[in-house]
Amino acid sequence: MDAPNPKRPCLVPLGTSSIENPCSLPIAPDFNQSNIDLTISSFLSLSDLPLFSLPLSIGCSFDRVLDNVIPSIAGTSRDEFDQDRFLDRTLQLASLLYKSTKRCIRKRATLQNSTSWPLLPELTIKVFSMLDTKSLMQASACCTMFNKCAMDRVCYSHIDLTTAAEDVDNGVVCVMIHRAGKELRSLKLGSISSSAEPTTSLLTRSCLTPLTFNHGFTGGHLRSLHLYHLRMIDCGSLSPVLSACLNLTDLKIVGLDNPLEQLGLLTRNCRLIEHLFIEIYGAAGLITDSSLLEFAANCPNLSSISLLGFLLNDAILQKLIKGFRRLKHINLSSSPEISGCFFRGLELCGKDSPLETLILRDCYILKESEVLLFLNSLLAGDFKYIRLIDVSNVDGLVCDGGNRTFEPRFPIEELKKQRSNVTFVAIFESQSSLSSSRFPLEELNKERPGLTFVAEFRSPSPSESDVRSPSPSSSSDSSSSSDSSSSSSSGESSDESGTEEEEDED
């Protein structure tokens, strides 16, 4: 039995198929476009006839015509070639008709969407500009109307590729930056999750090079640059990029493998920078006075600084606070060299200091006595703009004799009365304080092993440690929550502790 669709031999090699290029079809000498249009229109008007099975169906008409035409070609000198060419042309015409029909369907759908979609194109573009880049690409694939709106440069003003970090390579970044053009305002690259392996990133050292194209035209419009866990990027690759971003005001680098001495180099060309956040992987060297002076001179408008994991000592920190007169937010968490002695040198500038947020989480040698001295200065009226202080430490604070305490003696009640708008967070997590709590955890584990007990003490999470503008409502509730935080960590519980208890049964 013959195969249902036997493969015809290709006697003459053919070039590029004219299916993809309709203009490649041969044109008759007496070609008349209007006659062709009329013929096709007459052909398509037969759609009311049955399509298959019946003798008067269009399908049977096709079969009869082909059966009659093919024998008429037989007997010529090149009958096999002419038959193959005729059949190929028939398939090409059928394909062209199919593609034209699909285009017509899409045009009708676009017209219907434009009439039924409640938002104007300008508002749709505005909504799309608020989406992260991955969601924007998904929306653009829905229909032609959305695709046209998603191609507007405004939609790429804020490029966020952190939600699809594993699929982003240099080419994707280049295309996104090119689409944004002069509308580019912010760019986020990398994986926000710290658990992501650095090998999963497809980006290289040159991923930010498109910002320097055309003499830095696109980079000159950039205002915010956030890079997360891109180990291959260092100061050597960042410096030429930042030199093109002259209007940058917000720089955030999480996971920088770089010594502290390069701070001045990073900010040398970004004199408008206001918010600086840098977290390093390993220990960095101590910053020198010359580097600090260069850093301060490069960033006269700096109002928020977060240096996580740096080897900053108290002397450098004191100069840092005094050197930046506009500093409102300071986050120096995980700095192993800060003891708190810098508080003593801030008495002269304390009253008029614009400082609003001070975060010293997990500073290993931070002393209880120095924190107490700072709190007393608050009671005396210094730092009148401060709203948030965080000295939480998983290892506790250093007390007299070099020991560590998880129950520091802080004037919480006085602070609540005199500075009720200040949020003071002091959470010290330790196994001893947990075991000494009044919760029967051991008995609960024995009696109900499938039960999960969660006791959450209200405090800013580590991911929110880079606070810029704490709301007044949160500040007003801080006095009770901060008092409860310190008391709860020492194993004391009360009805006013502000502790949230939640039980979830697996």
From Swiss-Prot:
Q: Where is the stretch described as Disordered?
A: 452-506
Q: Where is the F-box domain?
A: 115-161
Q: Where is the composition biased (Low complexity)?
A: 459-492
Enumerate the Gene3D superfamilies for this protein. Ribonuclease Inhibitor (3.80.10.10)
- Composition-biased stretches, type Acidic residues, lie in 493-506
Record-linked InterPro entries = F-box-like_dom_sf, LRR_dom_sf
Q: What name does this protein carry?
A: F-box protein At4g02760
Q: Which organism is it from?
A: Arabidopsis thaliana (Mouse-ear cress)
Lineage, highest ranks first: Eukaryota, Viridiplantae, Streptophyta, Embryophyta, Tracheophyta
